[in-house]
Amino acid sequence: MKKALLALNSIKKSGVIDDYAIGGAIAASFYIEAINTEDVDVFLFMSASENSILLSLRPIYDALEQLGGRVEKEYIVIGDWPIQILPAYSPLVEEAIIQAVTVQYGNIETRIFTAEHLCAIALDTGRMKDFYRVASFIEQGKVDRLVLNQLVIRYKLEDRTKNVLNWSSDEN
């Protein structure tokens, strides 16, 4: 993972991307017991190119290939780690990128989503493994329930908390 983080920091420093934040299982592993995963989910802001309304990952992939990455399916593999580049696809993810926290991975600085944003995005995604992850955060006391509750209400995720976690967003 070290090579992947160094490459991401390099393309940030060179201006290919403005910033990034890691989400998914890798980010969750900074808070709760390690979770098996095969890739690194990297979220960032993107805008369409001048001549197109479509978003293109090509400039990012080109820059990462110059740093030793190779494209495989929807990933760019750096070292042994498949990196999935994901545009900020919702206001919740945009907020998660903006409010991401800086952490150390060994001697490398990187940014990850807050525990509360990871949980809110997991609730929004709605897969069983995501609900399990939210329950793990809560059971291990790694999430501020008040902050999570505010996200749940702001992004209208109350039905997810009631149906899956037996937790009403009215609870603090």
Model regions: which residues?
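Compositionally biased terminal segments of proteins
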Residues: 1-172
